[in-house]
Amino acid sequence: MDATMQTTKHEYQFEGAAECGYPPGRTGLSPAAQLPGAAAAHSLDMQPYSHLDDSLFKPPTPGSAPPTASTCAGVPSSAPRRRPRRLRPPAPLHYDDYAPPPPYSHDHHHHLEQGGGGNGAASRCTAVRLQQRRAILHQRSRPLRPAAALDRVRRVSELRQQRDTGGRIRRERAEGWGSPCRLSTRGSAAPSPAPAGARSAVAGRIFRVVNDIYAAMGIHNMFIDADLGGVITPGFGLGKVKGGRQAGVELTFMRTVELAEFFTEGRECVNCGAIHTPLWHRDGTGHYLCNACGLYNKMNGMNRPLKQPRRLMAAKRPGTMCTNCQTTATSLWRRNVQGETVCNACGLYFKLHNVNRPLTMKKDSIQTRKRKPKNSNIKADRSAKAVQRASPRASRWRAYWMRRRSPPRLGYYVQSAEGMKLEEPQHHVMYIGVPELGPDTRTRRTTTTPPCRSPAETSRPTPNIIIIISTFVVYICTCVIELPRSDRRRRRRRRSPPKYTFTRHDYI
């Protein structure tokens, strides 16, 4: 204690002298002592503290007791002095070495099937799985920014790899420049930068082909992630190209449809030669067939026949001439009853009328016409157009009621050579029958009338009458509802006092 006090006094004098600019060992005067005439006042003020200087800074005599608070204050101490209590040094802190928890595995509760008790282990496994699943769902539910897309895929893949255990990471080396194929099976024990991916040999073959293609383009480290939708995505970071350079672009996601179109490019149907089809088939020998040829071959057991245009058949028979009209140009060559070659016009005429076609009907060019729909009438169309032009408003009302009308019942009979046939009529077409195919009535048209309806159908009111009646009923109901309201208004007007009218005397 004495040595400490002596050292403290010495250091205090040394620091004070150094701060005042004096050499060590020489203390500077106080500001009060430096002023002229203030030295006496300073010494007078410091007299009450002289005993402190003696007790604190003077070395004590050997065998004397250490100074106390009472002696420092100038009060003689008569009470028994206590021995100061020694403080024990603090005990050193003890830190246990941190040991990471053991890796999660399912081996500790396989004895459940053997009849052992493992409820605690099973509950811990369930809790860990629920926690990992919640973490995955939380990562999926967060809003994704374009810059953090790859980071999110990496985090999800790491969580899935931690969840799936008992498997192994399978690494394959792709062909080409030897870039590693980052394919991992489900159940990798340690986290890896490659996500959990394809689990079949087909996906591995597809990956190798795609990796070779992109390796030729200078981009490596591609992987297939079947858990993320079966798409092909680039590896994390930029892949290395041949020569140690870095690829300057990152590939975007490629859809499975685009991948399928890429791998089916270059196929051709061996039957019809088609190169585009929604689905490719194979025949018995393994050759590719388009969808139409493949279905025909599967249903009929033979290749689908190819139809050739009929107009090209005349060019394949040069020198052929019609025996009736001596023409050499026709869309289709026919044979008559005697087996002679005739043109298309003469053959059809003889087939319809059983007589040869007269030469006066011969045309210099082939007459082509548009096929008209069945049961069509030109006059009906013309009359409808004339009515629309004459009265547009009436035509609009007519179209409105035609749309509101229910479709007619099935059934009116049409005469034909085969018998009676049931057909559904159209609204804007007249009922026209098919002529009998007799020799004398080939060109005659027979018009049939619609079948008679039952009395219940004929007595049914028309839509016009129904609308008129409904409108009248609504009007009557509206009037009945409005009458009490008008009576109330009239009564209120009668009960209200008359309004006061100002006269010229009120302003005086």
UniProtKB/Swiss-Prot annotation:
Tissue: Isoform 1 is present in the ovary and the testis, isoform 2 is found in the larval and pupal tissues, while isoform 3 is found only in some pupal tissues.
Compartments where found: Nucleus
InterPro entries to which the protein is assigned, alphabetical: Transcription_factor_GATA (IPR039355), Znf_GATA (IPR000679), Znf_NHR/GATA (IPR013088)
Region (Disordered), start-end ranges: 50-122, 178-197, 364-389, 436-460, 487-508
Source species, domain of life: Eukaryota
Stored PROSITE patterns: GATA_ZN_FINGER_1, GATA_ZN_FINGER_2
Pfam family, one: GATA
SUPFAM superfamilies xref list: Glucocorticoid receptor-like (DNA-binding domain)
Gene Ontology molecular functions: DNA-binding transcription factor activity, RNA polymerase II-specific; RNA polymerase II cis-regulatory region sequence-specific DNA binding; zinc ion binding
Protein name: Transcription factor BCFI
Organism whose genome encodes this protein: Bombyx mori (Silk moth)
